[in-house]
Amino acid sequence: MGKRLLDKLWERHVVTTNENGLDLLYIDLHLVHEVTSPQAFEGLRLTNRTVRRPDLTFATMDHNIPTKDVWNITDRIAKQQLDMLRENCKQFQVPLADIGDEEQGIVHVIGPELGLTQPGKTIVCGDSHTATHGAFGALAFGIGTSEVEHVLATQTLWQRKPKAMGIELKGKLQKGVYAKDIILHLLSKYGVAVGTGYVMEFYGETIGTMEMEERMTLCNMAIEGGAKAGIIAPDEKTFAYVKGRKYAPRDYETFEKKWFELYTDADAIYDLHISIDVTDLAPYVTWGTNPSMGVRIDEKLPEKHDVNDERAFSYMGLIPGQSTYDIPVQHVFIGSCTNSRLSDLEIAASVVKGRKVKEGVRALVVPGSKRVRDAAMQKGLHHIFEEAGFEWREPGCSMCLGMNPDQVPEGEHCASTSNRNFEGRQGKGARTHLVSPAMAAAAALYGHFVDIRKESYDGAISYS
């Protein structure tokens, strides 16, 4: 019987197996940020240990930093965590993309753009959306703080091998429908626990048509379905993306030959298989308090089915059967490790070019990294957004989570390109609606949700 992509990635990294069936995996890349690392570094100090492989470790500042005035850090805990990361990286000789550094940005944005993320690697980070890197054919997953310490000290991690889920995507997406809509559809149909105990492998003709940044969006939110990770077999698009980046292998051709072996064999069998035809898929909007509570833009909100629905409707200030078009939007956030890359900003800019943000709506665009910011500004995207009434910010996690100054006021609704809509995720009492960059941009113009498929934009920005 053939092997799945998961099998090939896993087997290449097993150091040993213990009596309980746990495998000790070698970790090829450890990404670090300021929130989940302080206790881990302190653990090294208390036990007089060093970081085993600083050269396989890379840190950045992203969660806590302000995006309006990056140096004006007024929150005491945030400043303490940022200062500690700077001190820890200096002491343990870990490379750091500090505030203001040209490589700084959201950890799951800078990994791929710097070429740190590569096919065949095992990648971990103290952040649940580490699955993003699986778009490159890497086995990438989030870990807890105690595990962060273990990897820092040993460059290994004890893990139980998950099962493999194959998610086949067939058909061609309509104009105005994106990878974000695919994953929101998957979650709305199968729920937030469908992937528990599995690694999701996305494959099929639809994947072949997707660019790398769309694939990253898919894998980024695999965790929202309960999966350990999301992976996609590397192909020519993957190799072209990695080639020439700062940390890409110098002996690139040798690595590329090995990467060509990373695919699921034709006779391999998944433990669970799901097939989705995306041809008639529509833009999605979440209405509730987890990512599975979503509907097509052309559907009405569902009826209450259980106490969770009742609580969600109450928290969100919505009613069953309400039209998605009637959901008010006071805030728009285009950013996060899900949708803050250059192509995301280009799509949003193509929607708002020459138009104005609705009076009373606050709209933010937060590039995922300094490099994304600079590339967007070279193309004049910041002028398009600012002329439309958006705020153009510095890189960071920003309004994705309520850990920095960018928050949504209590009781107000935000169209967000992020990945989670839990109660209080964007601030106390904030009401979050997950959408694609195109849908978020359109909501900023109208002050409510609209069907982006009916808007007169071409999905690609013209710089004339």
UniProtKB/Swiss-Prot annotation:
Q: Which UniProt keywords apply?
A: 4Fe-4S, Amino-acid biosynthesis, Branched-chain amino acid biosynthesis, Iron, Iron-sulfur, Leucine biosynthesis, Lyase, Metal-binding
Is-annotated flag, keyword Ubl conjugation? no
Which residues make up the binding site for [4Fe-4S] cluster? Answer: 337, 397, 400
The record's catalysed reaction(s) read: (2R,3S)-3-isopropylmalate = (2S)-2-isopropylmalate
Q: Which SUPFAM superfamilies match?
A: Aconitase iron-sulfur domain
Q: What is the required cofactor set for this protein?
A: [4Fe-4S] cluster
GO terms under biological process: L-leucine biosynthetic process
> Which InterPro entries does the protein's record reference?
3-IsopropMal_deHydase_lsu, Acnase/IPM_dHydase_lsu_aba_1/3, Acoase/IPM_deHydtase_lsu_aba, Aconitase_4Fe-4S_BS, Aconitase_4Fe-4S_dom, IPM_dehydratase_rel_enz, IPMI_cat
Q: Which Pfam families did the record assign? A: Aconitase (PF00330)
The UniProt record lists the EC number as: 4.2.1.33
**Which Gene3D superfamilies does the record associate with it?**
Aconitase, domain 3
UniProt KW Amino-acid biosynthesis keyword: yes
Named in its record, the pathway it takes part in is: Amino-acid biosynthesis; L-leucine biosynthesis; L-leucine from 3-methyl-2-oxobutanoate: step 2/4
Family membership, please give it: Belongs to the aconitase/IPM isomerase family. LeuC type 1 subfamily.
The protein's role, per its UniProt record: Catalyzes the isomerization between 2-isopropylmalate and 3-isopropylmalate, via the formation of 2-isopropylmaleate.
Name of the protein in question: 3-isopropylmalate dehydratase large subunit
- Species of origin: Bacillus cereus (strain AH820)
Task: Name the gene behind this protein.
Answer: leuC
